[in-house]
Regions:
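Metal-dependent amide/peptide-bond hydrolase catalytic core
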Residues: 1-170
Length: 170
């Protein structure tokens, strides 16, 4: 990209404009859905670019996330295809892992698909062949300024953890 004074944008090439065009393409894309896990989601998590308001931006970057419920290779190909339409944009894969199908039919627990990441897929099968996600609180308040867990939920989770231990030891 090429910097210039913002009063003469035709003398430069804006990295932020190029990146926004690519991000708009990704935002407008449709992503796979699963009858079991629900829809995949796309999020532009961070966006950085430019030096000052009166300079055509010489650089920009974004960190995005697709939480996929199926077909990791297909999603990667789709992202690469969309980005390939924007020759000034470079694609770097930072982190990836496939959808996680866990043990979900356990007596005494309600099961539901969730749209958030977990380290569970990284647990090695030989050490942890049966895996679940369980814990108090709500993902709907996670990562926000008012994140919290209600005390009764925390106390009730003790019994839940005990049930899980007994389930996995049986």
């Amino acid at each position: 990209m090429k910097t210039s004074h913002s009063g003469y944008p035709h003398l430069g090439k804006s990295a932020t404009s190029a990146l926004l065009a690519a991000l708009n393409g990704l935002s407008a894309a449709s992503w796979p859905e699963s009858d079991l896990l629900g829809p995949s989601t796309f999020n532009i998590g961070t966006l950085e670019g430019g030096e000052k308001h009166n300079i055509v931006a010489p650089s920009a970057k974004a960190l995005c996330e697709v939480r996929m419920v199926a077909d990791l290779p297909g999603i990667k190909a789709k992202v690469a295809d969309i980005i390939s339409r924007h020759p000034d944009i470079e694609l770097n894969w930072v982190f990836e892992y496939p959808e996680a199908l866990l043990e979900w039919e356990i007596d005494g627990f309600e099961a539901a698909p969730v749209a958030f990441g977990t380290d569970v897929p990284r647990l090695r099968d030989e050490f942890c062949g049966r895996r679940v996600l369980y814990g108090p609180g709500s993902i709907l308040v996670a990562h926000g300024p008012d994140e919290f867990i209600r005390v009764p939920e925390l106390i009730d989770s003790i019994a839940g953890y005990k049930k899980l231990v007994l389930h996995f030891l049986s």
